[in-house]
A protein has these predicted regions:
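Core alpha-helical transmembrane segments of integral membrane proteins
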Residues: 229-306, 310
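Conserved alpha/beta core of the MobA/IspD/sugar-nucleotide pyrophosphorylase nucleotidyltransferase superfamily
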Residues: 15, 144-265
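Conserved core of the sugar-phosphate nucleotidyltransferase
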Residues: 70-74, 97-99, 109-183, 286, ...
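Short phosphate-binding loop-to-helix
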Residues: 63-114
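Hydrophobic beta-strand segments of well-ordered beta-sheets in folded domains
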Residues: 1-7, 51, 55-60, 101-102, ...
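Conserved beta-strand termini and adjacent loop/short-helix elements that scaffold enzyme active sites
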Residues: 61, 86-88, 129, 186-190
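Generic detector of multi-pass transmembrane helix bundles and their immediately adjacent loops
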Residues: 308-411
Length: 411
């Protein structure tokens, strides 16, 4: 069995120095691990790393009177892991067998998840140069190295805690035991430290300093971005922390976007097609923001699927509203005739990017851009013919790009 060991002992401090103390004394008002980053506690982000590394059991060392662990327990158990809370080092021993592997993360350590998975893939004690490590608040190990606040070691070493007092700080002691037991050291790459992708956070000021980069890292994926996706990313970077801290995140944004789409449909029903199309453009931007929130949560917490509706649902909603609005633009014609051209346009917008591997083709899927173009056509009284012209242009553009793509692949 693979066991995760998390600590909620060291308190939030007003400066950036100092390592976590022992378990003795009064319980801290707020441990570092319960500070929130991107709407979730540092302990929850550490749990995501542990679960991604295949941990089946989660042990949290925390003072007896500490509240706030229930969400962490629910997250662990919903992922199929066993959850245990202990108040001291000796409580760990009965939960780890000699055949187990232990993955331990120190108080307040924040690591980029993909990086942590790579560095902790094998048994190791992660270290860093002593100057930068001690300056950041990590424990000094020897003349050359400081701790990096993470390690993976055999479970048989846990039994050595029985030789120590019960009020020692478990991570620091197990780190020494692992090094004495022959677990190899591995240095965190210098560029990782320099880029701020491996941190020890002591207070809210330090949380706020790393939060923008943390959010940006988990927002954007490889590949071409639609204009509305880029704009949504900037909105989430600016307003995201406040919404995430409030606990609403993308849910409120998705609901607001749904209201805008409904208002656009109502406006079109009353003959204000230009206004309706502008509202649809705003609705798509809102849905893009909600998708960004879902992507951030999925990637930062290593979730198998987002908790919000998938982007394909938002696409169907907006396409349905656009189809209705464009159909209303042909009010005197039969329903079949009124919907034919809009159906061809929306169908080609879905089809061409799917069959053409071209970065520019991704722009065709941007419903906000489409709605803005359609609103301009409506403003100048060109909507009916404009839909047909856009459909033909998409068809010809798709044929040309597909032909170029075939020539490139054949050569």
């Amino acid at each position: 069995m693979r066991v995760a060991l998390l600590s909620l002992i060291a308190p939030v401090t007003g400066d950036s120095g100092g390592a976590g103390g022992a378990l003795g004394g009064a319980s801290p008002i707020l441990p570092r691990g319960l500070m929130r980053l991107g709407g979730h506690t540092l302990a929850r982000h550490q749990l995501a790393i542990a679960l991604a590394l295949g941990c089946d059991r989660v042990i949290v060392v925390a003072p007896g009177g500490l509240d706030g662990l229930l969400p962490l327990q629910h997250a662990a158990e919903s992922a199929g892991a066993l959850f245990h809370r202990v108040s001291g080092a000796h409580g760990i021993m009965g939960l780890v067998s000699a055949q187990d592997e232990v993955i331990a993360l120190g108080d307040g350590v924040l690591a980029w998840p993909d990086l942590a998975q790579e560095l902790l893939a094998t048994p190791t004690v992660l270290v860093q140069p002593v100057e930068q490590g001690v300056a950041a608040g990590f424990e000094r190990l020897d003349f050359n190295y400081a701790s990096a606040g993470a390690m993976r070691f055999p479970g048989r070493l846990v039994e050595r805690l029985s030789e120590l007092p019960g009020d020692v700080e478990p991570f620091a002691c197990l780190q020494r035991i692992a090094l004495q037991g022959g677990v190899p050291q591995r240095s965190v790459p210098d560029e990782v430290i320099a880029q701020g992708r491996w941190n020890l956070l002591h207070n809210e000021r330090e949380i706020q300093a790393v939060e923008p980069d943390w959010i940006s890292h988990h927002l954007f994926e490889d590949g071409a971005l639609q204009p509305s996706e880029w704009l949504a990313g900037q909105v989430v970077r600016l307003a995201g922390p406040a919404l995430l801290e409030a606990g609403s995140g993308g849910t409120v944004v998705a609901m607001a976007a749904g209201v805008l789409a409904a208002l656009g449909l109502v406006a079109g029903g009353f003959g204000a097609l230009t206004l309706g199309l502008l509202l649809v453009a705003l609705a798509w931007l809102g849905f893009a923001c909600a998708s960004m929130f879902g992507r951030f949560e999925r990637r930062s917490l290593r979730l198998p699927r987002p908790r919000l509706a998938p982007a394909v649902t938002y696409r169907w909603i907006v396409d349905g509203v656009l189809l209705a609005l464009l159909g209303l633009a042909h009010g005197e014609r039969t329903y079949v005739a009124a919907l034919f051209e809009p159906l061809m346009l929306l169908g080609l917008i879905r089809l061409v990017p799917a069959v053409v591997a071209n970065r520019k083709a991704a722009w065709m899927e941007d419903r906000a851009l489409l709605a803005l173009v359609l609103s301009l056509l409506s403003l100048f009284g060109l909507l009916r013919n404009g839909v047909a012209v856009l459909a033909v242009a998409l068809l010809l553009g798709g044929i040309i790009m597909a032909g170029r793509q075939n020539r490139l692949t054949s050569t």
